[in-house]
Amino acid sequence: MRIVYCTDSVCILGGVEIVTIVKANALAKIAGNEVWIVVADAQSAPIRPLEGIHLVDLGVNYYTDYYGLKGFYKKQRLHKVHLEKLLNEIKPDVVVATGQNERNLLPLLQLPSKPLLIREMHFEKHYRQKKKKKSMLQKIFLWLSEQLDYLWRIKGYDYIVVLTEEDKEQNWKGWNNVLVMPNPITSVCDVKSTCEAKTAIAVGRLVEQKDFASLIRIWGKVTEKHPDWRLEIWGKGELEAALRQQIEESGLEGKVCLMGYTAEVLQKMSQASLYLLTSMFEGFGLVLIEAMSVGLPLVSYMCPTGPKTIIEDGQNGYLVAVGDEKTFAERVCQLIEDEPLRKQMGQAGLKESEKYRIEDIAQRWMQLFRDLLAKKSSRRNSR
């Protein structure tokens, strides 16, 4: 089977990029498959090794020589021409869009081979509306972006794949071509947490979506009862200076530590005893699966979408209403004060994480591709 993944880049450190590489590598190992990753921007080496993958850089470079809206649409036209030419040379069986810049282009391409077109949704459908809008112009722009995406271009795809049943049920009612496939665990760590260290951990980009400001306030409450525990936040991002200032003004230096970027996320998790997530929204919350895979209990905001799918409240962690910082702190304190409960929840999560192994997810994707191609062929032959 000839499979093409189209995405923005595999050089930028992000969840979509890592998941795309991991899935493509796994599919390339299956006999009879040939896999491509087609990117618009490849300014440096891929963030993960590519194993048996054809990497094609279209050289559009959205992130350089960018001159506003006019420049963006000029690059979109260039992207369309190059992508259409390449796909007509490859003649793939399946084309999967995982990025942002190609998502509205693929349904417009003239592809005589009629490949199966799949759009992967790595964010909850209405994620744009979850952002804190700062002006009327931004509100209008986000609304127009959503209308363009969901009322027009997305209908050109054969199938849309979302990450959770929650997203499908809440946001895609009436759509008969929406399917569910979770993300896989993207790394493996043989070392598991003992849940005995006096450390909690959170991982993610330091951006508005992750709401680490809320987590810092929560930890201020936790510290009042448990000053010997500390919180490590691993990641980089545009809000780093603001978060450092918040930590200093809250008197939490040494209690909350911004650790910076690490490529050894699972190893860092295995040295902690709790995983905490305060995101405003997620597409899936892969980091929760990764934390479970090293035996950590979880405390998470019940944001759309993902945490409700991953966490069984009271079994492998706790779910808390978004913004309820008091209850969140109480749940953290409960786990700090009850080591047997921490370990019990950690082991429950470890067992649950096994169903997200990349080998199993890759086989599920292959079966899905086969079924959808057979269905498309049957429809074509019946005309």
Specify the residue positions occupied by each region the protein language model found.
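N-terminal strand-loop element at the rim of the active site
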Residues: 5-13, 26-73
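A conserved mid-protein helix/loop that constitutes part of the nucleotide-sugar donor-binding site
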Residues: 17-22, 198, 205-221, 238-244
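Membrane-proximal helix-turn-helix segments that form the acceptor-binding/catalytic region
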Residues: 84-85, 139-159, 173
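Short His-centered aromatic/hydrophobic patch
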Residues: 97-103, 121
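Carbohydrate-associated surface elements
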Residues: 166, 184
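Aromatic "clamp/platform" in nucleotide-sugar-dependent glycosyltransferases that forms part
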Residues: 261, 280
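Short hydrophobic beta-strand element within catalytic cores of glycosyltransferases
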Residues: 297-301
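Conserved acidic donor-binding segment of nucleotide-sugar-dependent glycosyltransferases
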Residues: 312-314, 318-325, 333-340, 354
